[in-house]
């Protein structure tokens, strides 16, 4: 007999709590998006944080968005930027784009050149929205 979804979830949680960062990343995404489980942003935050601390780029990206938007936690622009930088350094194009957006929001004139560098990296990695923002900054 195949295990139920609840039994599978218990095993996943146990593996995460035993220190499996990949399982923590999996659980964080499941709870963040509400896939196969009811959405629970508090649990998502906990599991994604664990995975992020082990260097999981997607977890860092999702956490960055949570801190940026205040979704499931208090908004924290500095923490969002830190997490997006970690994910961007691992090649996540949308994280590169978000780094640029936060830099521009913090201090447009001071951070413009650095933001453009991040937008170019994002665009070169195939994130088309970065092209649009680059043309807006140049235009």
Where are these regions (language model features)?
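Helix-turn-helix repeat elements of alpha-solenoid scaffolds
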Residues: 1-6, 40-42, 76-77
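Terminal, low-structured helical/coil segments at or just beyond the last alpha-helical repeat
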Residues: 3, 123-139
